[in-house]
């Protein structure tokens, strides 16, 4: 049976859109990568055939491009796509300690972002999401423009924190003028984020302002306590 012959609620892509990737079976996830089938066989059939050739999912990373290419209906192009996906998954799972950035103090955060922010001609507001060991698990640009407490929504930042299971947050933004003195809007924004973090139990560790080869920590300067 072709994928197109399935009811919409049974098709892998539609199921992912409606329910999320975590609700799909191994075969359905592979079928999305395989994309198209062969005569008489859907991508889901080929995915099931691939799964029958291994004992467990961990074996996928050991399959060579040649091994994948031998599975009827895969072919070289799909074999390359699958191998690339398996390699990415392996790298995500086994990232070395060297790949992990730990933030132990405001200087660490400033050093991490200084080169990316100090020469910008407009303000950029970034959130760093940390795990329980203060290792960065995600970085997100919240907005670019002129900082205004009305446009930095705690909801956007903290919903992202919940999504990536973050224990704490550090926010940073730059002052194109090079002067790191916090504005009234900087202080208002910090207060709103801190209050929201206190309610949710996801601590705002600092708000760091990047200037010209320098930085200011709002915690170190006494604008708020942690």
UniProtKB/Swiss-Prot annotation:
It holds the Pfam family UPF0758_N. Zn(2+) binds at residues 173, 175, 186. Residues 102-224 form the MPN domain. Signal peptide: none annotated. A motif (JAMM motif) lies at residues 173-186. Gene3D superfamilies: Cytidine Deaminase, domain 2 (3.40.140.10). InterPro entries: MPN, RadC_JAB, RuvA_2-like, UPF0758, UPF0758_CS, UPF0758_N. Keywords: Hydrolase, Metal-binding, Metalloprotease, Protease, Zinc. GO terms for molecular function: metal ion binding; metallopeptidase activity. GO terms for biological process: proteolysis. PROSITE patterns: MPN, UPF0758. PANTHER family: DNA REPAIR PROTEIN RADC, UPF0758 PROTEIN YEES-RELATED. Belongs to the UPF0758 family. NCBIfam families: PRK00024.1 (NF000642), radc (TIGR00608). This is UPF0758 protein SSP1105. It comes from Staphylococcus saprophyticus subsp. saprophyticus (strain ATCC 15305 / DSM 20229 / NCIMB 8711 / NCTC 7292 / S-41).
């Amino acid at each position: 049976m072709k994928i197109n012959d399935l009811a919409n609620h049974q098709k892998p892509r539609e199921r992912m859109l409606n329910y999320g990737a975590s609700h799909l079976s191994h075969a359905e996830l592979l079928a999305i990568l395989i994309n198209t089938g062969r005569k008489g066989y859907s991508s889901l059939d080929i995915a099931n055939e691939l799964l029958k050739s291994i004992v467990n999912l961990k074996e996928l990373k050991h399959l060579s491009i040649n091994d994948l290419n031998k599975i009827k209906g895969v072919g070289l192009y799909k074999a390359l796509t699958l191998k690339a996906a398996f390699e990415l998954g392996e790298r995500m799972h086994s990232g070395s300690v060297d790949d992990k950035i730990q933030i132990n103090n405001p200087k660490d955060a400033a050093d991490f972002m200084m080169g990316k922010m100090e020469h910008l001609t407009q303000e950029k507001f970034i959130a760093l999401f940390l795990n329980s060991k203060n290792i960065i698990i995600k970085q997100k640009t919240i907005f670019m423009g002129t900082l205004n407490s009305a446009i930095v929504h705690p909801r956007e930042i903290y919903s992202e924190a919940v999504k990536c299971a973050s224990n704490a947050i550090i926010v940073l933004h730059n002052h194109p003028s090079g002067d790191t003195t916090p504005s009234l809007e900087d202080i208002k924004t910090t207060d709103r984020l801190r209050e929201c973090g206190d309610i949710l139990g996801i601590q705002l560790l600092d708000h760091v302002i990047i200037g010209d080869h320098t930085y200011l920590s709002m915690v170190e300067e006494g604008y708020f306590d942690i």
